[in-house]
């Protein structure tokens, strides 16, 4: 399939250094809020890239659940493939694509596990159905049929019908402490604007990159 004729112009305007926030987390929050305000589908969806012990990269879509100066937080099954990769190599890449705004953000950083208290606080805030699903699914393991998963879900739903659901030991979150953040804004004639924030000790440097 030849896709060479699929192209479009970027029309939403550029990004200038004078428009940037000094702190990249502030810049990220500004863009994220604009994506939310624009009613984009799944504005908190991000690609999480990890590498296995053989150097093979893997990607998957995960939802961002918190962001602050400490980093970017997501939750997962601690026995999942991504968790196994992180245990081997905790360097991670995140990518947020906000296509309608002609923007994307690329983040590199180091993953660290959240505390048991942080895990419990978020787990208890989830809908009960989501809590049950977290226990029913041993993520990335092989199953013979969908019915096996659905049967386990219904079994647990009945078991916890009238009680509190405990946080499973194999479920938790990670915080990605950022080392770099790149902000990309589409530009006319493919002259896109790219700014890279790089951590230098407790400060950030900002460089413009060629598109």
UniProtKB/Swiss-Prot annotation:
Signal sequence residues: none
EC supergroup of this enzyme: oxidoreductase
Note accompanying the cofactor annotation: Binds 1 FMN per subunit.
Cofactor (UniProt): FMN
Catalysis: reaction(s): pyridoxamine 5'-phosphate + O2 + H2O = pyridoxal 5'-phosphate + H2O2 + NH4(+); pyridoxine 5'-phosphate + O2 = pyridoxal 5'-phosphate + H2O2
Record-listed E.C. numbers: 1.4.3.5
Binding site for substrate: 7-10, 65, 122, 126, 130, 190-192
Pfam families found in the cross-reference section: PNP_phzG_C (PF10590), PNPOx_N (PF01243)
Family statement: Belongs to the pyridoxamine 5'-phosphate oxidase family.
Function of the molecule: Catalyzes the oxidation of either pyridoxine 5'-phosphate (PNP) or pyridoxamine 5'-phosphate (PMP) into pyridoxal 5'-phosphate (PLP).
Protein name, as recorded: Pyridoxine/pyridoxamine 5'-phosphate oxidase
